[in-house]
Amino acid sequence: MHELSIATDLINTALETAKQNNAREVISITVEIGELALINPEQLQFMYQVLTEENLLKGSELIIINVPAVAECQCGYKGPVPDKTTCACPNCGLTMRAVEGRDICLKTMEIEV
């Protein structure tokens, strides 16, 4: 369950950002999660709620935006990844290279100062 470590990292980043901006309250944080990051959004939400009970993020909303996987192949194909387990190109069968949908990124925060 790597959602715990992801939630911890997101919370630490959000707390540091809130501190740097003299926030009195954090209303929400928005996170983009790539399809290939293999994160369970429900588990991440749960971990976020548990880990924010005793800090400035208590009561804040975690907004998750799913980013679809996009890959490209030597044959020229660029698009969705139909088979996430092998990343095989739908045109030629070669293994594709992911170009989008791998990352986890804290995009925005809504705060009260």
Swiss-Prot record:
Belongs to the HypA/HybF family. InterPro entries: HypA/HybF. This is Hydrogenase maturation factor HypA. Keywords: Metal-binding, Nickel, Zinc. It comes from the Archaea. HAMAP family: HypA_HybF (MF_00213). It comes from Methanocella arvoryzae (strain DSM 22066 / NBRC 105507 / MRE50). The keyword Metal-binding applies. Ni(2+) binds at H2. The keyword Metal-binding applies. PANTHER family: HYDROGENASE MATURATION FACTOR HYPA (PTHR34535:SF3). Involved in the maturation of [NiFe] hydrogenases. Required for nickel insertion into the metal center of the hydrogenase. GO terms for molecular function: nickel cation binding; zinc ion binding. Zn(2+) binds at C73, C75, C89, C92. One of its GO terms (biological process) is protein maturation.
